[in-house]
Amino acid sequence: MTSRRTRLVMAAVLALLSVASPRALATEAPVGQMSWALHFSLAPTLFEPAEAAGLITPFMIIYALHDALVKPMPEKAMAPGLAESWSRSPDGLVYEFVLRKGARFHNGEPVTADDVKFSFERYRGISAQVLKERVAAVETPDPGRVRFRLKQPWPDFMAFYGTPATGAAWIVPRKYVEKVGEDGFKKAPVGAGPYKFASFTPGIELVLDAFDGYWRKTPSVKRLVFKAVPDATTRLAMLKRGEVDIAYAVNGELGEEVRRTPGLSLRPTPFVATHWLLFADQWDPSSPWSDRRVRLAANHAVDRQAMNQAVTLGYSKITGSIIPTSFDFYWQPPLHAYDPIKARQLLAEAGYPKGFDAGDFWCDASACQYAEPVLNDLQAVGIKTRLRPLERAGFLKAYQEKRLKNIVYGLSGIFGNAATRMEPFVVSSGAFAYGGYPDIDGLFKEQAGELDPKKRSALLHRIQQLIHEKAMVLPIWQLALLQGVGPRVAESGLGLIADYPWSAPYEDLKLKPR
């Protein structure tokens, strides 16, 4: 009898557990600490979704501190976040989001429609101009609903708003921001993500603590520590000593060393980051770069496959495009073969038989490891240039303000589609565009209003063909980062979100039991 009663009680308990929400089941308190060695310097701009700058790097921190209405998650590319659901009107002019009940910021305030409207209107990052030119109004009929009313149907609204193509859908608390001001928010950010701000030492270390009020689940790991370690050898040494659990960007020979080291594992993370060279002076008639033959010569000078093997152990893709291969409306261009003889011939035809001084070669300091082999190949055919690394914040500021000349090492790893990737870099009005071409600008404007998918695809393919024909840029590769993972990690989060290079979602990370 006792045995039968016990079985009935257990069955009842299991039945209750089977219908309980994930949030209700997450009763265990967070424990332990997970640490990362990062390949770039830490700056307060990383806490600020309103300043997302066309790179995937800031989302490493944004995914922890903040939450979006819609965002990429393990189950899908556009998963419900602070919005439980969303819909589009039949005429394509209105997008309505229903907010998640019970979602709160770290200071206890509820996430409301007013916060969503405020976050959009305050957004000033990548593609802000495009969004605000096309949105007629943001309406808040009640605290739990938001409507975006467009000036005309725009097929890319969710590509720009519902993915990390921009930071516009990541929500900050209006009352708190207005109380502390913009500088105060960067000093002590408050978000609605799974982790809350604990401390920050500029350029050195960021510490975040688990937020037990996060709507999706309580994180398993109590504390996250991000350490800025620009030197790759030092990052690997820290991983081997157990000072960090994950070391980002341990490339080339260091990646091989991770493979050989007992207890460590190498995790390649292919993602949507494409790298290229911008010939910033191609619109200056007095510059050698204004001659298409010179730009073609540079394209034939670079041995991309050798670079891929040496730096990323062959995990990157040579695509010939600034558009990731997985993006909607991607067009595969013919690849420029590595041919230094042809490169020299093209330079001679353009009037530079002995090459020329190409001036400065600008790069984000964290990307210089990729820029150096490109520079060496250019030098080998007579294109003489000098590497000029800048700390990331300074590089992005100078890049956007159009203060960089000659050659710029460009890159982007944000989500979206072919249109969202091209808009900041190829269209003449783009945030990082140093010039443009009327035919490309005209086609881009035309595709933005085209609702027929086949016609739109043809327009976007034609733009990509023109970029290739003009040799407007020097595409390098679609990067795969090599990440080192230490022995304490049960779930690193690497690869959980498709095409995303960092650990995420942070609330899913786990340490091994002691």
Features from the language model and the residues they span:
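Surface-exposed binding/hinge segments that line
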Residues: 23, 29, 130-176
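Aromatic- and charge-enriched surface segment that lines or borders ligand/interaction sites
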Residues: 29, 84-127, 141-147, 235-238, ...
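Detector for C-terminal structural segments
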Residues: 31, 38, 201, 267-270, ...
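N-terminal lobe/hinge region of extracytoplasmic solute-binding protein
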Residues: 37-90, 121, 190-191
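A structural "hinge/loop" feature
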Residues: 40-59, 82-83, 109, 157-167, ...
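Gly/Pro-rich hinge or "lid" segments in bacterial periplasmic/extracellular proteins
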Residues: 63, 73-77, 164-219, 223, ...
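Ligand-site clamp/hinge motif
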Residues: 100, 122, 211-257, 384-386
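Structural transition elements
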Residues: 285, 292, 317-349, 367-369
